[in-house]
């Protein structure tokens, strides 16, 4: 028996003597992450295609991160000067990153990635889908951020400093998974104003942090499409993002630009074009009047879907 114990001890020491394999490079600690970006064509079957009607393709990326499992479910975003991007996820995370453009202004990458948890008014991270299903966001001019949530329907104001607090919510009933997907600042209505839209109904509201919400127009859409994002544009125009999915045709997306009464421009994305579950929309106006639109997709944490970020340029005719 003693001989057996000696042999067992020798085998144990031999097993412990070998160190485990180390990563090829250091693994980051903290919120900073690497964002891998692979350029994709607008149409994989026709890589030369660079337009959809009046919209010119300005680059597209398939995004992922080797550093975290939290880089998924991106459901809305906002952009500010210098290409700083802020996005929220379906599970209560906040992503910050910066766009990378080449010399021609085409989208080629994303850098300076950071992921942190959204918190509740007590300062604790949101827990689980029921509490953290953030779907819409709006960055106000003073740096405050508004976030709309599904499941437990609410809008919270995240001040530039301090804990979040409830913000006005439209007086309406929403399905569990069909709340205020569309949210954006509405500066023409006031410095603390935001426009909100119901996914299934297409009903919109103009809200103010300091007062309440007032019903606006209902966005016309086919019944299979949901209203998922909105952004105000110069000259009183608004861009709306509509999304549909079925197992035969897959994802379909329409970007619609309207003024108060008229549809001005429209871009439809469907197979074989680069399309996925686009839920986020942002716009940047250039000095010559061109509008750069960015569309970001929510992969639903599914390996069969992708996180895509596409850029399109549109120049109004007037």
PLM regions and their residue ranges:
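Sequence/structural signature of beta-propeller domains
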Residues: 15-318
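Bacterial N-terminal signal peptides
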Residues: 6-15
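Positively charged n-region of N-terminal signal peptides that target proteins for export
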Residues: 1-4
